[in-house]
Amino acid sequence: MLDTNRPPEASPARGNGSHWCPVSASSPLPTRVVLLTGPSGSGKSRLSARSGLPVLRLDDFYKEADDPSLPLVEGSSDIDWDSPLSWDADAAVAAIVELCAGGRTEVPVYSIATSSRTGTETLDISRTPLFIAEGIFAADIVARCQEMGLLADAICLRGRPSTTFRRRLARDLREGRKSLPFLLRRGWRLMRAERGIVARHTALGAHACARDEALGRLAACAAGRHRTTAAA
């Protein structure tokens, strides 16, 4: 678990640290968000849980199945749940703004199995100066969070496409997310597209890395260091 209350210290993150700047320990730390993205099945939820930080699940901002604006997979009748058009970015950003401003927000509870919202719940992060917002579309709101001064870091988890495929399929079957034929069609499509997905997230401002480096960057944020500009 990361300690968000200790004063800034040397960052364990790897690579060039020129995009980090220290925050004074003598004044209260403003609440900021780490946007955690990556291909479906890349380990975002597991990493978030391991960090011990509060987590906003961006998957809960999916549109419902009867929304006429939902996109379709090209050449298919399947809804394209991997398109940013299937997701309510404005509502997600509004929730992040509320958490950074007041430490509390109401979020939808979304069932992926039924593609519907089943209720709402309160997410209260209290005085915690850092939280994670994780989901496959997190990179799509990097620029907006950066412009509002809310961004601590943006991370894209990267791994082997074959490993991601196996992890994603096992999870989706275990949770009964969709039918097996749908999961297989989606899984093969995403495995072939995975390198392009990571490249897109990087172009949107997320730093692509494996789990250990991601944990190091989270620790740097928890120590009071944040990005001054989006990563190249």
Each language-model region and where it sits:
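The conserved Walker
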Residues: 40
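Pre-Walker A (Motif I) flank of P-loop NTPase domains
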Residues: 29-33
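Conserved lysine of the Walker
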Residues: 44
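ATP-dependent NMP and nucleoside kinases share a basic, alpha-helical "lid"
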Residues: 118-177
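Hydrophobic positions on the alpha1 helix immediately C-terminal to the Walker A/P-loop
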Residues: 47
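NTP-dependent small-molecule kinase module
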Residues: 2-28, 126-127, 189-232
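Conserved nucleotide-sensing/catalytic segment adjacent to the nucleotide-binding pocket
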Residues: 54-58, 63, 68-116
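Hydrophobic anchor at the beta1->P-loop junction of P-loop NTPases
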Residues: 36
